[in-house]
C-alpha cells in the first residue's frame, strides 16, 4: 500500500532507504553536516537494541562505566598504529574559553586510549583481573560521505574494554562476546543471519592483532559490518603501562580486548528486512509489536480498540492504539512504513459479528478472529513472524553467496551479492584488484564456516563483496 509513497527498491535502493528513514520518522539530518537527529520512533528501536545487548553483556560479567568525551591528543600518539588508523577521522579541539589550549584535545573516536590510562591505574595485581568494562556513549569520527545511521560524524554505540592475565583469556572473552552477545542478539532478536569470521590484516581495527566480525547481507546484496570484537594483544597495555603483579611476584603486561556495536545496526535493520512498503521490524525487537487501528472514529469502535489493546497488554505484548486523524488508508500506510509486525483493524461491520482483522506486516496475510482469541493468536503469530523473517533472510544470504574460483569471478559475482573463494587465491595483490571495483574482503572463515584463530591458518576461505 505504501508503494506510491516510497521509491521502489529496484528503482533506486539508496533513495528507498532515505525515504524509509524520513517517512518512517526514524531520523533527520542535524544542522552540522554528518550529524543526526534520532526521532522518537528511531530512538525506541535503538533503546530496544540497547536493552537486549546490555542484558547479554552483563551476563558475561562486564560492568557499565563512563569515560570522558575529551581525550588528550598525546594519548593517541602513544600507540602509533592506532593514531595512524584514526588520524583522518579525528575531530580535534584546539581552543576553549577563548584561548588556545596547551595541548589539543581529541573528541572521542573510541576509548582504548583513555580506558587504557585508567586500567593502568586500577590494575595492580593478578587479583584485579580480569577487568571487564563496557560503556554506552557517543563517538565522533569525521565522515566525508554521511548517510543517516550508516555513516555519521557522530554516532551512538557501546564499546567494551577488558584486561586479562593471558592471551588465552583475552581471546576467549572476545570470542565469548562475539558469539554469546553479538551473534545471539543478531540471530535471535534482529533475525539477522551473518557470516562470522576474522578480518584480514588490511581490514583490522587499528592497533589490533585480530578482529572478529559479523557481516550481514542487505537487500541490495551489499555487506554491512554489524559488530566487531578485537584482540589487542599487548599493544595498548605496552603503550599505557598496564601491568599486573603475577602470583609469582613478577610484573607482567596485560592482554586487552575491545568490542563494539553501534546505531548502524538500525540502518542494517532497515536494509536487511525492509521492502517496498517500508520497514519490517522483527517482533522481539519491535518497540510496538501490534497497532490497533480504528476504521472509524466511533465510540463503539474506540471502546473495542481499548478492549483489544488491554487484552494484548495482559498477554505481555507491546501495543499501541491509533484512533488517529486522517483516513484509515493513510494511517495503515504510515504504520506499514514503520514496520510494526501486526496490525489489528477494528471496524463497525466486523464488530457486529464480534470479530476483528489481524494483519501480518511481513507477508500481508490477514486473519478474521473473534475478540476473545485475538491476543493469544497474536502471541503465536509474533513468534512465527520472528522465525519466518530469520529464515527468509538466511535463504537470501545463502542464495546470493556465490562460490567462485578466482578474483576475476569474485569481481563479477560481487556486483549483486557475496562471493566466496579460497583465501590463497586472493592475497595482497588480489585485495588491491578487488578494491579497484569497490570490493573488499569482508571476513575469513574456515571451510566449515567457523572462525579461525588468525589469518595464517591453512585452507581458509574469504567472503568478498561491496559494502556500506
Map each language-model feature to its residues.
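NTP/phosphate- and nucleic-acid-binding module
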Residues: 1-468
